[in-house]
């Protein structure tokens, strides 16, 4: 539930390596 400061509208979350996932076009962690 914490925003990772990255959007994932066109590309996957680069912050995915830090545990972030795409939700509602924005990357979140927990």
Curated annotation (Swiss-Prot):
Keywords: Disulfide bond, Knottin, Oxidation, Plant defense, Secreted. The keyword 4Fe-4S does not apply. PROSITE patterns: CYCLOTIDE, CYCLOTIDE_BRACELET. GO terms for biological process: defense response. It is found in: Secreted. Pfam families: Cyclotide (PF03784). This is a cyclic peptide. One of its GO terms (cellular component) is extracellular region. There is a cross-link at residues 1-30 (Cyclopeptide (Gly-Asn)). Disulfide bonds join 4-20, 8-22, 13-27. Belongs to the cyclotide family. Bracelet subfamily. Probably participates in a plant defense mechanism. This is Cyclotide cter-O. It comes from Clitoria ternatea.
